[in-house]
């Protein structure tokens, strides 16, 4: 029997390329000093999640496409970055929506704690977006390098910041599995430019944070104010066995729910914005919002 050819697109993704001196990576956001090489770009084939059968799910694969609209308007999303009132509205109304989405997708979990959100907007073409990686201004742009939001030590850091060390220890003792779950949604237009890509590692049985992640230690990091403390970023290393998945023309009425950290590495989902070689020349700039929640199963 012939093997079915999955609908896909071709594109470019950035992955860890090490440091200039062979030491642990660092980035000083105050002056731009770093020993981290620019991400190495790889040509990839990216399969459309819409066409996968069976569909990946949060519980089985660590990521899932859902069709759940929001009551928040485009203007209210955009206002969140302009005023304290707009920020508070997102944390009140949209955080509650994201909790309900996670509850529905997971079939019910013990505890969901929304902790932060990030608005992103793509400005400029592929080259300008890639070159700005690591600059302060790039923190609100799509990240064209494969990464995980956190690993175990840095996830414990944000947990302790959020609930305190004593409560954190209580939760960790009670739950065998916990994760940071992101709800990622386009704003205004479909996410055609710089779509989000998942690096499925089901074919890598030994995949874990130690073997497939490089560290970039942060100094004077301006992102602390909106994502919490994190001593280093987790940049993903290349492996020929990754399967790359995305959603074609993800609509604002849809969202992607995925584990950006999981205490069981099998479910931790490396992800990245990627350059789609087949993106229409007139595709609109990409705006998106992601809400990060600590989830205890």
UniProtKB/Swiss-Prot annotation:
PANTHER family: BLL6449 PROTEIN (PTHR34598), OXIDOREDUCTASE AN1597 (PTHR34598:SF3). Oxidoreductase; part of the gene cluster that mediates the biosynthesis of squalestatin S1 (SQS1, also known as zaragozic acid A), a heavily oxidized fungal polyketide that offers potent cholesterol lowering activity by targeting squalene synthase (SS). SQS1 is composed of a 2,8-dioxobicyclic[3.2.1]octane-3,4,5-tricarboxyclic acid core that is connected to two lipophilic polyketide arms. Its EC number is 1.-.-.-. Keywords: Oxidoreductase. Belongs to the asaB hydroxylase/desaturase family. InterPro entries: AsaB-like. It comes from the Eukaryota. The keyword Oxidoreductase applies. One of its GO terms (molecular function) is oxidoreductase activity. Pathway: Secondary metabolite biosynthesis. The keyword Oxidoreductase applies. This is Oxidoreductase R1.
């Amino acid at each position: 029997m012939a093997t079915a050819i999955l609908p896909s697109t071709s594109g470019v993704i950035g992955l860890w390329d090490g440091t200039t001196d062979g030491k642990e990576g660092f980035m000083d956001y105050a002056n731009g000093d770093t020993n981290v090489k620019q991400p190495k770009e790889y040509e990839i084939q990216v399969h459309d999640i819409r066409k996968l059968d069976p569909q990946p799910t949060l519980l089985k694969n660590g990521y899932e496409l859902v069709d759940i609209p929001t009551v928040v308007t485009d203007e209210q999303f955009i206002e969140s970055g302009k005023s304290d009132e707009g920020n508070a509205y997102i944390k009140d109304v949209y955080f509650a929506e994201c909790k309900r989405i996670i509850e529905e997708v997971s079939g019910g979990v013990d505890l969901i704690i929304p902790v932060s959100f990030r608005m992103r907007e793509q400005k400029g073409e592929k080259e300008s977006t890639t070159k700005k990686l690591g600059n302060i201004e790039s923190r609100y742009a799509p990240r064209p390098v494969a990464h995980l939001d956190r690993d175990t030590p840095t996830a414990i850091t944000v947990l302790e910041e959020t609930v305190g060390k004593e409560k954190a220890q209580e939760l960790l003792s009670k739950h065998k599995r916990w994760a940071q779950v992101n709800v990622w949604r386009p704003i205004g237009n479909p996410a055609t430019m710089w779509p989000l890509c998942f690096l499925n590692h089901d074919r890598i049985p030994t995949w874990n944070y130690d073997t497939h992640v490089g560290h970039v230690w942060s100094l004077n990091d301006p992102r602390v104010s909106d994502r919490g403390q994190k001593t280093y970023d987790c940049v993903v290393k290349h492996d020929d066995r990754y399967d790359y998945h995305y959603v074609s023309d993800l609509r604002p009425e849809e969202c992607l729910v995925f584990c950006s950290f999981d205490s069981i590495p099998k479910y931790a989902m490396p992800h990245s914005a990627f350059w789609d070689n087949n993106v229409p020349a007139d595709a609109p700039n990409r705006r998106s919002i992601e809400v990060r929640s600590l989830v205890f199963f």
